[in-house]
């Protein structure tokens, strides 16, 4: 669904990174939006949107404040654990040791993007054009590190990020449903955009 939706909005899409609440997906697509490769994180929600939500709670920030706060960093603090269970304890220890909040957040953002990019590397790397989907694509710091790592590893490629990136999966799902309904209807039946049909 994510690949189909991304391809519908950006027809030249060949690589999709979907950064979701509970999982990350690296997808390669061919023309017509056909999926040729699919990889998803296979352990837990660490490094996904839910992890960022937990981090926001630990710092008393909203999700919308995470990215801008991380972008104030003067350095990126090395984060050893991306496990949600242990992240809170590590953050408290880093703060106790004098690390600054923006620096810790920058390190956290960089760490989760590195995990996502390793997923893309396992799937065969970035092929031009690259489309970034999911709600986390709206996080400024995540976006900064994704762009940086794509350029560092694969050179200059066209990167697509839609303002409604969070809805790409829903769009693809709706398009699949519409196509399947159309295929099941008697020949000559027209499907209205509203979802109704007329003979």
Role assignments for model-derived ranges:
Residues 124-149, 162-166:
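Glycine-rich phosphate-binding loops at beta-strand->alpha-helix junctions
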């Amino acid at each position: 669904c994510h690949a189909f939706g991304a391809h519908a909005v950006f027809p030249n899409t060949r690589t999709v990174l979907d950064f979701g609440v509970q999982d990350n997906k690296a997808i390669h697509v061919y023309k017509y939006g056909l999926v040729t490769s699919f990889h998803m994180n296979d352990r837990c929600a660490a490094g996904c949107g839910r992890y960022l939500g937990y981090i926001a709670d630990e710092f008393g920030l909203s999700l919308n404040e995470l990215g801008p706060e991380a972008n104030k960093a003067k350095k990126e603090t090395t984060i050893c654990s991306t496990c949600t269970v242990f992240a809170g304890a590590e953050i408290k220890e880093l703060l106790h040791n004098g690390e600054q909040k923006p620096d810790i957040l920058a390190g956290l953002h960089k760490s989760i993007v590195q995990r996502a990019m390793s997923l893309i590397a396992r799937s065969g790397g970035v092929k031009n054009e690259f489309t970034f989907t999911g709600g986390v694509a709206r996080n400024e710091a995540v976006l900064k590190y994704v762009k940086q790592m794509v350029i560092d590893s694969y050179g200059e490629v066209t990167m697509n990020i839609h303002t409604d990136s969070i809805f790409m999966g829903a769009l693809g799902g709706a398009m699949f449903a519409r196509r399947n309904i159309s295929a099941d209807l008697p020949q000559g039946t027209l499907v209205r955009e509203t979802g109704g049909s007329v003979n």
